């Protein structure tokens, strides 16, 4: 509130005041501790005159000071030193809006604004009000020096507050405070509050749980008291050491007759209302001249079976802050209103699973949003994901949809690319359907066949992964010639182009990833066990039939072994073969006897 001093009733100055820009209700809000953030104090000095006036200068002064005073009640204090008092100048800054000159200047009729700004230091103390014998006040005072005889100067003052509050992403808002212990042979108790920090004017939910360990034990009245502990300091050359004075006061006291019984124990939640006026309580602070902290003390009466009453006491430490949304109305200065709980819920950090991707990809320019989304979206990383829509970049059951930033492929290129663009499952041949692994379709169930196909695909992908980083081509594999023999069937191996971007971006389950480390080659048509283990003849060698199909050279670095035809074993030669017996120990003995 601006207060104008000086001047006569019929003054040509109609308006003269100080206004702040970035301060709602004249409050500067700082977040975190004294070294985290700073704030800029900016505003204007408004002057409105109805007729020309002569002035010497227009000045503005920023002042901040701390005041500490108390009466020394010790017996050793002399009568002249009973009152201890100290005033410290925290801020002192001045502005002059007119050039200094001995001659007066004439200001014509009209409205004038004089801007100013100042960077507040990060360690500026909070505004303290409401504590007896201590306060910290910040004031902006503007003065208008008129060139009249006698001089009639005008002054206007604006008092603003500096509040340091906890940031909305502070961990103290999420940490609960709990005290639990056992009274041997009597009760097991636990008291807790869901958070450590509460705003002035809000409510504190106190949870109390008691488990009886003594038969016949009952709970009497429960008393909760919110206490404020203050310590004042004076450091001066006149004193040999730092003087201090400690005192405390009860802010809120609430008593209930007892606790309700739930099953075999007592449990209840009690709401404690914090005062909403700075004249009744003070926020937590730790400054050079004052220190303030708060505790919630509990007292529970226990009625023993023999008739005597025991009392259980404990305390919960907490912090009181001024919420930024609790700047009150001007008529009731110092009264703060607002919903602190909604402020915390709206500004609290999201959970890890919702925020981790924003942090990882923050600042990376997105040249192709749809293509990059395929690599980073969790929907494409789930096994058998079915979150595909009609406008998805890759859809095996829909017409080709061009990806943003890419040219649509021609029908000729799509015919050999094995992407299945523009083809429905009904129009595919049986051979094309066999080449399509069940894991490729997002709607296919996961079965044993799918696991074998996944293992084959994992090993194939590991061998051609480097080639997949280049632009996909549609004609990487030449068409295979048809086999001449009915009993020899060539294996169909999926080419590099069939492993599209979505398949490479999927994260396989554990058994697929585990099987990818095996050294099993992705080959079919291997010889049967009897053919592979049949011993070869020492005189004749088996010749490979001339009708064996060979594989055309392919740019894909995948080696495909030809399938051996299932032919009967070669006949034995007609002429008898000389056999030689091994010289056993029996034959040696017989030769020696003969």
From Swiss-Prot:
Keyword line: Phosphoprotein
Gene Ontology cellular component terms for the protein in this record: cell division site; cytoplasm; cytosol; plasma membrane
SMART domains: Arrestin_C
Comp. bias intervals (Pro residues): 565-574
Compositional bias annotation for Polar residues: 368-398, 534-552
Positions of modified residues (Phosphoserine): 584
Biased composition (Low complexity): 404-417
Family matches, as Pfam families: Arrestin_C, Arrestin_N
GO molecular function: calcium ion binding; protein-macromolecule adaptor activity; ubiquitin protein ligase binding
Region (Disordered): 368-417, 531-594
InterPro entries found in the cross-reference section: Arrestin-like_C, Arrestin-like_N, Arrestin_C-like, Arrestin_domain-protein, Ig_E-set
GO BP annotation list: clathrin-dependent endocytosis; endocytosis; endosome transport via multivesicular body sorting pathway; ubiquitin-dependent endocytosis
UniProt superkingdom: Eukaryota
Family from the record: Belongs to the arrestin family.
Protein name as annotated: Arrestin domain-containing protein C584.15c
Organism listed in the record: Schizosaccharomyces pombe (strain 972 / ATCC 24843) (Fission yeast)
């Amino acid at each position: 509130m601006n207060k104008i001093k000086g001047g006569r009733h019929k003054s040509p100055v109609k308006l003269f005041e100080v206004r702040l820009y970035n301060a709602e209700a004249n409050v500067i809000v700082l977040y975190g501790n004294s070294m985290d953030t700073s704030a800029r104090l900016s505003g204007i000095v408004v002057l409105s005159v109805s007729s020309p006036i002569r002035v010497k200068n227009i000045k503005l002064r920023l002042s901040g000071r701390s005041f500490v005073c108390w009466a020394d009640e010790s017996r050793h204090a002399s009568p002249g030193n009973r009152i201890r008092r100290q005033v410290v100048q925290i801020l002192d800054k001045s502005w002059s809006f007119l050039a200094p000159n001995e001659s007066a200047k004439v200001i014509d009729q009209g409205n004038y604004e004089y801007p100013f700004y100042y960077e507040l230091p990060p360690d500026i103390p909070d505004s303290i009000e409401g504590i007896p014998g201590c306060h910290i006040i910040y004031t902006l005072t503007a003065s208008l020096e008129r060139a009249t005889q006698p001089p009639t100067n005008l002054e206007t003052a604006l008092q603003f507050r500096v509040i340091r509050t906890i940031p909305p992403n502070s961990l103290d808002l999420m940490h609960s405070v709990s005290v639990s212990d056992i009274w041997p042979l009597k009760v097991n108790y636990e008291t807790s509050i869901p958070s450590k920090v509460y705003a002035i004017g809000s409510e504190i939910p106190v949870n109390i749980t008691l488990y009886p360990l003594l038969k016949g034990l009952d709970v009497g009245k429960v008393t909760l008291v919110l206490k404020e502990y203050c310590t004042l300091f004076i450091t001066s050359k006149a004193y040999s050491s730092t003087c201090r004075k400690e005192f405390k006061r009860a802010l809120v006291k609430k008593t209930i007759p007892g606790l309700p019984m739930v099953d075999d124990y007592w449990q209840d939640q009690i709401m404690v209302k914090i005062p909403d006026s700075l004249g009744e309580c003070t926020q937590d602070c730790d400054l050079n001249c004052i220190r303030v902290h708060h505790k919630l003390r509990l007292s529970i009466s226990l009625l023993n079976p023999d008739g005597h009453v025991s009392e259980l006491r404990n305390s919960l430490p907490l912090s009181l802050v001024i919420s930024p949304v609790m700047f009150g109305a001007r008529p009731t200065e110092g009264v703060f209103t607002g919903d602190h709980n909604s402020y915390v819920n709206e500004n609290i950090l999201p959970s890890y699973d919702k925020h981790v991707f924003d942090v990882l990809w923050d600042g990376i320019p997105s040249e192709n949003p749809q293509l990059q989304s395929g690599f980073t979206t969790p929907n494409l990383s789930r096994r058998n994901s079915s979150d595909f829509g009609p406008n998805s970049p890759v859809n095996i059951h829909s017409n080709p949809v061009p990806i943003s930033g890419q040219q649509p492929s021609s029908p000729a290129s799509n015919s050999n690319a094995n992407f299945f663009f523009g083809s429905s499952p009904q129009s595919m041949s049986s051979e094309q359907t066999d080449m399509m692994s069940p894991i490729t379709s997002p709607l296919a169930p996961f079965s044993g066949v799918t696991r074998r196909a996944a293992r084959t695909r994992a090993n194939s992908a590991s061998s051609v992964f480097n080639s997949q980083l280049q632009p996909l081509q549609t004609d990487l594999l030449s068409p295979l010639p048809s086999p001449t023999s009915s009993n020899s069937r060539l294996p169909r191996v999926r080419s590099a182009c069939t492993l599209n971007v979505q398949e490479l971006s999927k994260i396989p389950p554990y058994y697929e990833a585990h099987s990818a480390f095996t050294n099993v080659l992705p080959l079919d048509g291997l010889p049967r066990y009897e053919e592979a283990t049949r011993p070869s003849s020492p005189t004749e060698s088996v010749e490979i039939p001339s009708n064996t199909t060979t594989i055309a050279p392919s740019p894909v670095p995948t080696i495909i072994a030809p399938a051996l035809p299932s032919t009967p074993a070669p006949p034995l030669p007609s002429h008898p073969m000389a056999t030689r017996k091994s010289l056993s120990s029996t034959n040696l003995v017989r030769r020696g006897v003969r």
